[in-house]
Amino acid sequence: MAESLRSPRRSLYKLVGSPPWKEAFRQRCLERMRNSRDRLLNRYRQAGSSGPGNSQNSFLVQEVMEEEWNALQSVENCPEDLAQLEELIDMAVLEEIQQELINQEQSIISEYEKSLQFDEKCLSIMLAEWEANPLICPVCTKYNLRITSGVVVCQCGLSIPSHSSELTEQKLRACLEGSINEHSAHCPHTPEFSVTGGTEEKSSLLMSCLACDTWAVIL
């Protein structure tokens, strides 16, 4: 960011030296970073293990500071001679704001990683329970699924006619686990299960995930 502020058009990168303007720039940068959470996490996911490892290669900090600087210069109450002041912004102040943004960026990523770890733990527990116990209903996650006369039923009210007369609890378990594992191969979030359909059409068991915007018919 410091290098970008030393471009040939030096006059475009000068701030009023009073504390209010410095604080306004700082607050607006922090607010823009908070509002750019989705953009930041998308870049983080795309980068994977090859992502930035230091402040010079942060995901979004420099871009946020440059965007906010341009926005600050365009406000109506900005002094007309703002771009003509001889005093450049103090580099120490700039670096302080930059470091604060880097800390905020890392905090957002850390919170996201903790969320992923929690989802992975929940998924592991779910799969372990399915393997060790009778088949748990994926919709209510409380009661056991049963297959009676070709219909998959649960105490929670779930009732889905099977598409195959040969469906067993073992086959249904394998189908559920396979679908969850296939989803987890490309998305770390825990999917949700629901029943679709009504009286006129046959009910189906649906697996969906809001995080990656995917869905699949399980049964």
From Swiss-Prot:
Keywords: Cytoplasm, Isopeptide bond, Metal-binding, Nucleus, Phosphoprotein, Ubl conjugation, Zinc, Zinc-finger. One of its GO terms (biological process) is protein import into nucleus. Widely expressed. Expressed in pancreas, kidney, muscle, liver, lung, placenta, brain, heart, leukocytes, colon, intestine, ovary, testis, prostate, thymus and spleen. It comes from the Eukaryota. A zinc finger (RIP-type) spans 137-212. Changing residue 103 to K: Sumoylated and increases total protein sumoylation levels. One of its GO terms (molecular function) is zinc ion binding. Residues 164-180 are annotated as: Mediates nuclear export. The modification Phosphoserine is found at residue 18. Interacts with the RPA1 subunit of RPA complex. Mediates the import of RPA complex into the nucleus, possibly via some interaction with importin beta. Isoform 2 is sumoylated and mediates the localization of RPA complex into the PML body of the nucleus, thereby participating in RPA function in DNA metabolism. This is RPA-interacting protein.
